């Protein structure tokens, strides 16, 4: 009794013309998620997913590669215009924006949604190198 091979469900092509790109640029990695207006994920990518490891994940080039990848995947679903929400203090913020434009997306608005504490938790102590 041989088990029949599992059928791989193909991703159906969504016809969405506009979306929201969430760029999360931390000190260690850059993650780009492209969603529709309701927040359902269309495509996503990160610097680590592109094969960068360790401290190379936090570079602007890694963020550029991740944004290009997420933009190409979203373009397959018909996304042409994007609103961009940028979050975090990382070095890949601007390069991710430029890469999304280079991937053929029209950027309508850019919003900085970095959470700023109203004197919340104590930050980690300064590094002494």
Curated annotation (Swiss-Prot):
One Pfam family hit: Ribosomal_S11
GO molecular function: rRNA binding; structural constituent of ribosome
Signal sequence, renumbered to the chain: none
BP terms from Gene Ontology: translation
GO cellular component, as recorded: ribonucleoprotein complex; ribosome
InterPro entries, A to Z: Ribosomal_uS11 (IPR001971), Ribosomal_uS11_bac-type (IPR019981), Ribosomal_uS11_CS (IPR018102), Ribosomal_uS11_sf (IPR036967)
Similarity section: Belongs to the universal ribosomal protein uS11 family.
Function description: Located on the platform of the 30S subunit, it bridges several disparate RNA helices of the 16S rRNA. Forms part of the Shine-Dalgarno cleft in the 70S ribosome.
Subunit structure comment from the entry: Part of the 30S ribosomal subunit. Interacts with proteins S7 and S18. Binds to IF-3.
Protein name per Swiss-Prot or TrEMBL: Small ribosomal subunit protein uS11
The species this protein was found in: Caulobacter vibrioides (strain NA1000 / CB15N) (Caulobacter crescentus)
